C-alpha cells in the first residue's frame, strides 16, 4: 500500500483541512491517509476547543483513514519538537511512504533547502545565529535572521520564514533529514486565510478565526456556511451546552496552583533567566489568560512560548523531565480511530512498526504516556463532557 501521513490539530476541522486531505490524495496517489493529531492540548499552548475523540471522528468522516494521537510532550512544544515527535512517530510505524503538509509557500524545494541548512548548521549560519541571540532577540527570530543572512538577504527566504506553516514544514523536513528517513515530503499551498488570521472568510477561514468567533459570539449560525456540516453540528451542540473550552478556562486553576501549591514552574525547560518570577508576579495582578500572557511576553519571549509554558504548568509537566522526553523519538503509537481502510493499514503497521501500537492503554506506563493521561485529567477539569478516566475507558473509534 502507498500510505501518506499528515500532521494535524483540527482545532476545529474546517474546509481548508478537507481541501488538504483531498489534495493529498491527488498529489501522492495514496491508498490511505494516516493522521497524526494533537490530543486535548495543542501547539499554541491552549486546550483544544473540542476533545480528541470528537476531533478524531470528524477526521474519519472527512477522508482520513487512521488517526494516531501525538503525545502531549510534543504537541505542547515548539515547532522543532512538535515536528520531531510527529515525524519520528510516522517514521517508526514503518508503513508511511510520504508526508504532505500545507504551507504558505507551496514550494517543497525551497522548504527542503532551508531545512538542510538547519540540519547541517554550517559555521557561517551558526555565527550569524550567535550574533542575533547576543542582541537579546528570541531564538525563532534570531534563527530567521541568521538564515536570511546566510542566503544573502534573499527576499524569498524572508517571505518563507514569516509564515507559521512554512516554518513547521521546514521543521518536518529537518526531522526527516535528522532521522535519515525515506519518507518523501510534499507540500500544498494553503488557500484562504493565513494560520494566524482572526477574520472569517466565506470559503477558507482559519481555525484561529473560527475559534475567535465562537468565543466572542452569542450566536454561531454564521459558521454554518463556513464549516463542514458535521463540524458545525458538533460545535453548535457543544456551544449550546457550554461544552467548548478556551485558554481562559485554565486561568483560575493556574492562578490557584501558583498561589497555593508552589510547584516549581522553573523546572520547565523553556523557563529561563528568572522568567518564573515574572510569571508569579503577573499572575497576582492579571484577571484573564490573555492579560497574563500579554503582560509577560517580551522581545525574548513570544506570546505562544508563554502560553505553552502556562499550559504545561496547568497539566503538571513540571514534575516530569520534559527536556529529556521531548528530544527522544515517540515511544509508542496510540490509535484514536480508523475506518475499513485504516483497519488494513493497522494490520500492516503491527507487522512493521518498531514501536508498540496501543489500541488500549498498557498496564505499564512510561512517562510520555503518563503525561498524556495527566493531560486528560487536566482537560476534564475544564470540559464537563470529558471524564477524567476516559483514556482508560474509551476504545478507538471504528467508522464503518
Curated annotation (Swiss-Prot):
A single GO molecular function term of this UniProt record: tRNA binding
Main location: cytoplasm
Residues involved in ATP binding: 7-20, 102, 165, 190
Signal sequence range: none
InterPro entries documented for this protein: Rossmann-like_a/b/a_fold (IPR014729), tRNA(Met)_cyd_acetate_ligase (IPR008513)
Keyword Transmembrane tagged: no
Alphabetized SUPFAM superfamilies for the sequence: Nucleotidylyl transferase
Reactions performed catalytically: cytidine(34) in elongator tRNA(Met) + acetate + ATP = N(4)-acetylcytidine(34) in elongator tRNA(Met) + AMP + diphosphate
Record Pfam families: HIGH_NTase1 (PF05636)
HAMAP family assigned to the protein according to its UniProt record, in alphabetical order: TmcAL
Family: Belongs to the TmcAL family.
Full protein name: tRNA(Met) cytidine acetate ligase
Protein species of origin: Clostridium novyi (strain NT)
Amino acid at each position: 500500500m502507498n500510505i501518506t501521513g499528515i500532521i494535524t490539530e483540527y482545532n476545529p476541522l474546517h474546509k481548508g483541512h478537507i481541501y488538504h486531505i483531498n489534495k493529498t490524495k491527488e498529489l501522492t496517489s495514496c491508498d490511505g491517509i494516516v493522521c497524526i493529531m494533537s490530543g486535548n492540548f495543542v501547539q499554541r499552548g491552549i486546550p483544544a476547543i473540542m476533545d480528541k475523540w470528537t476531533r478524531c471522528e470528524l477526521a474519519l468522516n472527512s477522508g482520513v483513514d487512521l488517526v494516531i494521537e501525538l503525545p502531549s510532550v510534543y504537541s505542547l512544544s515548539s515547532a522543532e519538537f512538535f515536528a520531531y515527535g510527529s515525524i519520528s512517530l510516522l517514521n517508526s510505524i514503518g508503513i508511511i511512504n510520504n508526508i504532505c503538509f500545507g504551507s504558505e509557500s507551496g514550494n517543497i524545494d525551497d522548504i527542503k533547502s532551508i531545512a538542510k541548512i538547519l540540519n547541517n548548521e554550517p559555521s557561517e549560519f551558526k555565527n550569524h545565529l550567535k550574533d542575533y541571540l547576543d542582541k537579546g532577540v528570541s531564538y525563532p527570530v534570531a534563527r530567521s535572521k541568521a538564515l536570511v543572512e546566510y542566503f544573502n538577504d534573499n527576499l524569498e527566504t524572508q517571505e518563507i520564514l514569516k509564515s507559521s506553516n512554512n516554518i513547521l514544514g521546514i521543521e518536518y523536513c529537518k526531522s526527516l533529514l535528522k532521522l535519515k528517513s525515506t519518507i518523501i515530503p510534499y507540500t500544498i499551498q494553503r488557500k484562504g486565510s493565513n494560520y494566524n488570521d482572526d477574520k472569517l472568510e466565506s470559503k477558507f477561514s482559519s481555525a484561529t478565526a473560527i475559534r475567535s468567533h465562537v468565543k466572542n459570539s452569542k450566536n454561531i449560525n454564521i459558521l454554518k456556511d463556513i464549516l463542514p456540516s458535521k463540524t458545525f453540528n458538533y460545535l453548535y451542540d457543544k456551544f449550546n451546552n457550554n461544552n467548548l473550552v478556551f485558554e481562559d478556562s485554565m486561568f483560575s486553576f493556574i492562578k490557584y496552583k501558583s498561589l497555593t501549591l508552589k510547584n516549581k514552574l522553573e523546572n520547565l525547560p523553556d523557563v529561563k533567566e528568572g522568567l518564573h518570577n515574572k510569571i508569579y508576579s503577573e499572575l497576582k495582578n492579571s484577571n484573564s489568560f490573555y492579560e497574563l500572557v500579554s503582560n509577560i511576553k517580551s522581545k525574548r519571549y513570544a506570546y505562544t512560548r508563554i502560553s505553552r509554558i502556562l499550559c504545561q504548568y496547568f497539566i503538571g509537566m513540571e514534575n516530569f523531565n520534559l527536556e529529556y522526553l521531548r528530544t527522544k523519538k515517540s515511544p509508542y503509537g496510540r490509535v484514536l480511530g480508523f475506518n475499513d481502510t485504516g483497519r488494513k493499514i493497522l494490520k500492516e503497521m503491527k507487522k512493521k512498526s518498531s514501536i508498540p501500537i496501543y489500541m488500549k492503554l498498557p498496564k505499564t506506563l512510561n512517562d510520555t504516556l503518563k503525561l498524556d493521561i495527566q493531560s486528560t485529567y487536566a482537560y476534564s477539569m475544564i470540559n464537563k463532557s470529558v471524564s477524567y478516566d476516559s483514556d482508560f475507558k474509551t476504545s478507538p473509534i471504528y467508522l464503518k
